[in-house]
Amino acid sequence: MAHPPRLNDDKPVIWTVSVTRLFELFRDISLEFDHLANITPIQLGFEKAVTYIRKKLANERCDAIIAAGSNGAYLKSRLSVPVILIKPSGYDVLQALAKAGKLTSSIGVVTYQETIPALVAFQKTFNLRLDQRSYITEEDARGQINELKANGTEAVVGAGLITDLAEEAGMTGIFIYSAATVRQAFSDALDMTRMSLRHNTHDATRNALRTRYVLGDMLGQSPQMEQVRQTILLYARSSAAVLIEGETGTGKELAAQAIHREYFARHDARQGKKSHPFVAVNCGAIAESLLEAELFGYEEGAFTGSRRGGRAGLFEIAHGGTLFLDEIGEMPLPLQTRLLRVLEEKEVTRVGGHQPVPVDVRVISATHCNLEEDMQQGRFRRDLFYRLSILRLQLPPLRERVADILPLAESFLKVSLAALSAPFSAALRQGLQASETVLLHYDWPGNIRELRNMMERLALFLSVEPTPDLTPQFMQLLLPELARESAKTPAPRLLTPQQALEKFNGDKTAAANYLGISRTTFWRRLKS
């Protein structure tokens, strides 16, 4: 479908689609973003929304749609416009449960497609009777609500459809989405539209692709982290390609952005300040056919559905700056060959094109894979490895930075409590210190990301039920992962995709998360 052309000074066009109380939240939050985008609310759902939007798209442009739950999934499977799905965060779920817990101890939680296994710990800690259900269709949701009503449930936590059905049935409905989560969806939609429209104006895109992290964000005072920071400063003296190696959650993109910032800070000090984009792509999260067009761009008519006038690829967008290739070990072999040629020739030819475009780009790549093993197995080109790894940076796992674990836990807990307007007391600091053995004993397979997420969860518990006695036993009750016996080697590396799939009873999303890879990569490995 041909959409109306975009003018260079146009703001992104975003439509919000909802049929329940989410409509009002959309309306309120959209006021905070109306200076950044043209936002139109659509109060329809499912097939009525699809029919209306398709008709509207015949004469109007839309860059992104924001929706939620089963309605959002329905739209995403039937529309060509990108649909940003709002997903409740851990904060949203626990805050809704805390609100429901003040009303009754008999609570139902009804979520789209899947239940939430992590709520088992919450149920035990606060002595609540949680009845978790999932649904696919509206009829399915109505059936789940009726069963909860028959079982004596008094309050139901869920999306707008669920809370409306619960209140129709005479129960209390607790809305699961927070304003913060909706704001994040608007931010994601803006980021996505900026990326998809970058071919129209490189300068505007460069301004939108600034780095978020600096060297000071590499937290930790251990000798290992001091060595990492010193290495980053050293690599900032060179424009050579860098390969960052480390487990999932060790901060590979953070390190890449720090190298970018430090290098161009030195560069601009000598030659004058300029715009230097930092462009990132996850090579394992995009299908091979799409990744080729994303990296190298395409000409008009290169394939069905290609944009009029073609589109610049990430190499062109990153000209004068840095291209960060995350999970480079997941890149398919045919694209590895083409990437090698671009790196050697310093020019790129768009898909369907014939004219090479010179590019001046520093490439920083990252992987959690064992590339040496992949090269031996023929999954990764050795010549490309040598081209990408002129400089190498190894990020240590958290279990090897034991001196950093307690200070990081305290820092993350402070930030998380502050976000909830809750104080960090001396008693909490003492409780963390008393729980140091528990924290140090855990293997931290998710590294920094896992520690931060745990402290966010702990903060939410503490904001609901403040306790002056944060004991190791209480920590293990709230964070059951800490009670498990740590293995010397991270568990994900011990399982094949098939074994992980069996471990999680066929749940592909859970298996991919456990292995620390995307669903696309999981499928690719499962088939190989």
From Swiss-Prot:
InterPro entries for this protein: AAA+_ATPase, Homeodomain-like_sf, HTH_Fis, P-loop_NTPase, Sig_transdc_resp-reg_PrpR, Sig_transdc_resp-reg_PrpR_N, Sigma_54_int, Sigma_54_int_dom_ATP-bd_2
Gene3D superfamilies on file: 1.10.8.60, 1.20.5.170, 3.40.50.2300, Homeodomain-like, P-loop containing nucleotide triphosphate hydrolases
Annotated GO CC locations: cytoplasm; protein-DNA complex
GO biological process: negative regulation of DNA-templated transcription; positive regulation of DNA-templated transcription; propionate catabolic process, 2-methylcitrate cycle; response to radiation
Database matches in SUPFAM superfamilies: Homeodomain-like (SSF46689), P-loop containing nucleoside triphosphate hydrolases (SSF52540), PrpR receptor domain-like (SSF159800)
Function according to Swiss-Prot or TrEMBL: Involved in the transcriptional regulation of the propionate catabolism operon.
Name this polypeptide is given: Propionate catabolism operon regulatory protein
Annotated organism of origin: Escherichia coli (strain K12)
Lineage, uppermost ranks: Bacteria, Pseudomonadati, Pseudomonadota, Gammaproteobacteria, Enterobacterales
Gene: prpR
